[in-house]
Amino acid sequence: FLFIVQGEGRGHLTQAITLEDMLQRNGHEVVEVLVGKSSSRTLPGFFNRSIHAPVKRFISPNFLPTTDNKRVNLKKSLAYNLLKLPEYFRSMYYINQRIKETGAEVVINFYELLTGLTYAFFRPSVPYICIGHQYLFLHRDFQFPDKSPVQLWMLRFFTRMTALRSSKKLALSFREMERDDEHQIVVVPPLIRREITAIQPEEGNYIHGYMVNAGFADTVESFHTMHPEVPLRFFWDKTETEEVVRVDETLSYHQIDDVKFLNGMANCRAYASTAGFESICEAMYLGKPVLMVPAHIEQDCN
């Protein structure tokens, strides 16, 4: 197997770690992991420590935040990525070369746009499978929220682009849904890591949290000003800061580290996050109350 992983946030990286472990335990081999990168994201240390296959990087499209660093700025993101098209074409050429040179028999795509475009333009002979909760958005029975029709169309269009010419789409879901053979979608349970299933959760006194965009620190601090007695421990991707930023006795920010993150999740009172998928599944599995604050249209749908 060859993995191609979108490098935005923690979720797709966590899925790749979990699936590699599952495949290896069943006698399969992951020959290489290709991870998309951009100027605004660095690869978290926990990924390099946890994944066993060789990791290679390629330049990939990414979404730029608004000036307050909370939600995605769609117009700015579109303009930025159009300017980067020559680099993305080089990345597609590189992905095609790695598919050939690794001798992989199957490619697994973790919602990376350039995988779909590579298969559209270069037509590799190796079959590929897409995996991610986002493929539920293409399922005939998925219920969308009452949001902008244009943004919902763009979300579904982007999701289709990640899966051009794919053999199958594995849609991760909390609940069971029928197969959608017309769209080659099979609904499967979330990829929960063995570390989570082995944890004995306890109820602590603090709120555990994760924010992809550090701009949400303003919101956290507003809550903290009103409720200074509530301990808050938030993880973020703000790489230019110390490993732990301790604001005061009851508020601290931590660089994303999976072992510390899972321990924090296991012993917290409740979990607060942008409305991603993987960490929400982990919190639900451990029986923790969850607060979700959507940061973009995909998370509105989540």
Model-found features: residue ranges?
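A donor-sugar binding/catalytic signature common to diverse glycosyltransferases
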Residues: 107-110, 262-302
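Conserved nucleotide-sugar donor-binding subdomain of glycosyltransferases
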Residues: 69-106, 113-114
